[in-house]
Amino acid sequence: MLGKAGSVVWMLCAIWVAADALTVETTQDILRAARGRSVTLPCTYNTYVSDREGFIQWDKLLRSQTERVVTWNFVTKKYIYGNRYENRVRVSNDAELSNASITIDQLTMDDNGTYECSVSLMSDQDVNAKSRVRLLVLVPPSKPDCSIQGEMVIGNNIQLTCHSAEGSPSPQYSWKSYNAQNQQRPLTQPVSGEPLLLKNISTETAGYYICTSSNDVGIESCNITVAPRPPSMNIALYAGIAGGVFVALIIIGVIVYCCCCREKDDKDQDREDARPNRAAYQVPKKEQKEISRGREDEDDHRHEDRWSSGRSTPDQPFQ
């Protein structure tokens, strides 16, 4: 009898403690909201304690640690914000009436993640009351960037790539192909996000390819034109490059030759300039007259000598 009575008392105490315990819950597991908008993370708590002395706290769960979002004190009504959440987060106006929800304004991609709501009361210090909710910030895909990897030469393999820099949730990618007559043709889809591989391309591969990037809140696309060329065009291209290089070498050689010839002419001119310029020297007119007069006197004197010499010679008798 005593043992049964003890069991009943223990059960009654357990029921009383459970009824008096603090509980916290979130009404939704996942919330979605667009970037730049506001979202309310729901959280409610239940307690039979009338004294609201304690605090409400929200944290963001990271891989190896937690990041404080906000702490709100029941008594002082003051906020303690995390580094990224100041002036962006507010607690419900009914915080003292079992509503521990918060509203986050101006959502960014960094707000994606799992959040934990906890309520602590002085009268329920032994109770660890927490609940979690996941926030997914929605961002439409940005216009994808399409590109070709490989040479568009008949017989080659090429890859078509498509990627959006932004998008939450992560965009899904799909491809469509149209021939030169604008007729859609069947295409084996790659795994979303992987390049589209085109093997042994030919004229049948020619046309344009459209990549579509989409998620829950938007859709964007880009297109690529595929025009395979014959291998001979590569030979012509290389020949053109070689011819251009040859012409460039000839031009450089002519320039070097002209420079060398000019340098040689400059040296010869310098050598010529170093010689005295005899033609440039002229005898003054006065001296020219004196020299001319002296020459005339000298000629007259020679003439007289020749004349006198001829007359003074006696005639020889004829034998």
Swiss-Prot record:
The chain crosses the membrane at residues 236-256. This is Cell surface A33 antigen. Residues 22-235 are extracellular. It holds the Pfam family V-set. It comes from Mus musculus (Mouse). Residues 267-319 are annotated as: Disordered. Residues 309-319 have a biased composition (Polar residues). Palmitoylated. Gene3D superfamilies: Immunoglobulins (2.60.40.10). Keywords: Disulfide bond, Glycoprotein, Immunoglobulin domain, Lipoprotein, Membrane, Palmitate, Signal, Transmembrane, Transmembrane helix. The gene is Gpa33. Residues 267-276, 284-308 have a biased composition (Basic and acidic residues). InterPro entries: A33, Ig-like_dom, Ig-like_dom_sf, Ig-like_fold, Ig_sub, Ig_sub2, Ig_V-set, Immunoglobulin_dom.
